[in-house]
Amino acid sequence: MKKILALFTLLLLLAGCSAGAAPVMYIQPAELNEEEEAVAKLLGADTDQHLFDVVLDGTAKTVRVNTYVLEDGKWELVTGGGGTTLKEGEQKGRMAFGFEDLRGEYREAVQFGKDFTAVKYGSSEEIDDPEGTGRTASFLAGRTEIVYEREIPIAIQINTTKNQVLSYDLEYFFQPEEYEKLGYEHVYALTVMFSQEALS
């Protein structure tokens, strides 16, 4: 009986460890302290800015940020393809993204340790949409595991004249044909990817 009880306890312990194990490397919406919150509000970062905390294992060499447009059921690269070099051993950082419309001006900032990079893409010219065009976006809302060489969707934006807009979970980035079926005029995605490969 003691052997059965010990085996049962061991199984419970193993199941509990595997079910509750948090990812070692992850990206999640930033957890700001009061002072950071106040500064963010002062700078307008509580509007179209999205801040994320990043935890790595120290072996990442680059981070790539890409934007895509949905064309015929497939994602086509709009901006990105390059990347930002990370110093060896960096483990904690922050990323910020700011945009109203991914077709227009888009901003990104990457900070690891004392290194900081900020880039602006696109044009600030106003986009002429048909009357009645609406826009909605879904953003990464929880902790997401970082796997090297795998893109992580940060935002999906839909611009459409349709009255009803369905916005799927960000994991549907990997099934773009689902967005194509809905017939929206414009669907965009913003992703990040961490790599152990240096920029070439």
Protein language model annotation of sequence segments:
Residues 13-16:
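C-terminal motif of bacterial Sec signal peptides marking the signal peptidase cleavage site
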Residues 1-4, 8:
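Positively charged n-region of N-terminal signal peptides that target proteins for export
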Residues 7, 53, 98:
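Residues in well-ordered beta-strands of folded domains
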Residues 83-200:
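Extracytoplasmic electrostatic interaction patches
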Residues 19-88:
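N-terminal export/targeting and maturation segments
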